[in-house]
Amino acid sequence: MILDEIVEDKKKRLPGHMARIPETEMRRMAEETKTREADCFYNHLKKPGLSIIGEFKKASPSLGTITSKIDLMERISEYNASVDAISCLTEEDHFHGNVAYLKEIRAKSSLPILRKDFMICEYQFYEAKVIGADAVLLITAILDDAQMHDFYQLARELELDVLVETHDEAEVDRAMKINPRIIGVNNRNLKDFTISLEHTRRLRPYVPEDKVFVAESGITGDEDVRFLRDCGVDAFLIGRAFMESENPKALAQKWKELYQA
């Protein structure tokens, strides 16, 4: 399965990161890194109306290279004027991400930043804090219950918000055991990368109304926005549609107005 391959490649990558900066040093740096604004990711998504997380990614296993022509700073400037938070891929092998991209975004944006990666060890959480992330992603499909609990607690101790990602009823049930404030449904099946917004519709009743409910992936047009609005979604995480758009600011404004209609 593609997901297993991604996780295995992540395990191979981590020793190199740790060799450059040992975990004890990364932890010390994380503990000394001042929190920019506590709970900012959660607060930006919790506000009334539709919240949008604009994603920066250069590639994905399902699409290959999305575009090689986009300038990072130009796209972030557009996001600064249009979205409520930014998601940055830092996975190197399959999404062509890099922690350097997140650092650059942090230097140019005051918006909350989600580090989107396959988080499988404590080191990555310390690193996320140090490079300037405000939130991290926990993917239920790649973690057991003990890891979910421990990683969530670690993130909150570091004053990082957490987006807990699910894909089916069993994963939502597992996610709810840690009582997350933000829970997402990935409409893309990470095992075969097929997409269906029906996952969000089907899982909405399982998520309490007091949680911020995020729809991830597969949002490409007006009909998708209407469908997810009617499902009771609080926020969208949008990658490809914004990365391929010539005017993401106008697209975000259009979809926010459509959501309110």
Task: Map each language-model feature to its residues.
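Generic leucine side-chain signal with a strong bias for well-ordered alpha-helical environments
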Residues: 3, 102, 137-138, 143, ...
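Glycine-enriched alpha-helix->loop->beta-strand junction motifs that scaffold or abut catalytic
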Residues: 82-83, 108-111, 130-136, 156-160, ...
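Hydrophobic, well-ordered secondary-structure scaffolds
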Residues: 114-143, 148-151, 155-158, 163-166
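Electropositive, surface-exposed helix/loop patches at the edges of structured domains
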Residues: 123-131, 153, 172-182, 200-207, ...
